[in-house]
Amino acid sequence: MSQRKLAAGAVVMGVCNGVKIALQLGLSPTLAHLLGPANFGLYSLAQPTILFVMMLADAGLGQSLARESEDNEAVWSSAFWLLLTLGVVLGVGVALWSGPLSIISRQPGLPPIMTALAASVLLLTLTISPSARLTRRGRIEVFALADLFANVVAGALALGLAFKGAGVWALVGQTLCLYGLRAITLNACAFRLPRLVFNWRAVSPHTLLGGGIVAAKFADGLGRMLEAGVVGRRFGPAGLGMYAFTNQAAWSLVQGVANPTGTMLYAHAVSAEDDAEVRALYLRLTRVTALLTLPATAVIAALSWRLTGAVLGPAWSSGIFLIALIFPSQALGTLGQLVSAAIYARGWARSQMLLAVANGALRLAAVAIPLGGWLALPFYVAAVNLGYGLLAIVIARVQLGWRIADALLEARGPAMASAVAAAAAFALGVNTPGGIGWLIVSAAAAGPVYLAALFCLDRKRTLADWTALRTALALRRAWAPVAGPA
């Protein structure tokens, strides 16, 4: 794969990720303040089912198809019809399941919400084939641009609906808009009209790897459904709303960086023959992910008490420890999981399935532990997040032979600098008046502190990062004339 194309994509992804992080930092607390824990709790009852079904609808074919030549029309056409059928069948299944779930949860308003969200399952299946084509072509920047565009428009829609008093429907509208715009944008970039053929023998080899991916996602989705049920039963709708919002906000923020970098690693690993080259890219992307996610989540954790008071509102005051522990632990855990892209590119899915099963079981145990109640819950879940990431790196050591210490060294500097920045933000937060304005000042001041600490504590790697960025920018400027006609 062209290093020039890879560098150009990395620059675009970096810019898009920065904008997405800023968007999430502003949007999530604003929606939480406008909607309150109860609306988030109602949405959280529907969300695990939707995410669970989406995992099945994907069928794991997206990652597997990226390894297939685009000239093989029998495979691509058969995959398209298979995915479309799955989307329709599973969407109908979601609508039918909403009735029994509303009775079990004693929430009569749940069926129309889930019926509307069922459309997002079909929209997801329409993005899988073009996504696989773009991955195979190495057009990783398209994912970032499409995702940023969809998130901006969907976020604006959610805010508008929330201000109009739409309640939980603001979150429903955001989800449908997000998946709808992704489907439109990605198909506009890489749609190919499928033939009216279906050959199971042609597509079945992809279901082997896809089946392993689905099994891993199935285990994760089932675990989160049970997890939501346990939290809701123990702490009520408001507690579930706080728990679900914190986990979803942290996940969205971190995945805004980890998804594109994981896609970048997978796209390169699929076509690369040199293992050392893939390993080097993995370490660089681990560094990039750490540089972006660790400071953001650390500062949020440091200012969690100010965030709940000034932005989320008094109804969220009991969620301070959740925010303070879930955000940074999610970022650290995700760093370890980045290596799964390289493992999937080799066609190995079993280890990731077992990892997902272990994570789901541990998270379920964490939320079910009675000792300590609500105050202890964040500590248990944070420990599972960290253990999940570390175990993923250990699996990479066993399967790929990559040293654990190398990945930890790439994240060490950003982690230490993030701790310094978080301490500075906390000190400012303690010594400044209340209100959103001073909260923003405290968070913004952590930025230059982070950069200075990074330079002092990890100078060699930081200078190398700066050199790599300048090289990438130079390649980005050179990309347009090279990509055009001679």
What residues fall within each predicted segment?
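Signature of the first transmembrane helix
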Residues: 3-59, 85-95, 115, 150-159, ...
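Membrane-interface junctions at transmembrane-helix termini in multi-pass inner-membrane proteins
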Residues: 6, 64-73, 123-146, 169, ...
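Alpha-helical transmembrane segments of multi-pass membrane transport and lipid-handling proteins
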Residues: 22, 81-106, 112-116, 156-164, ...
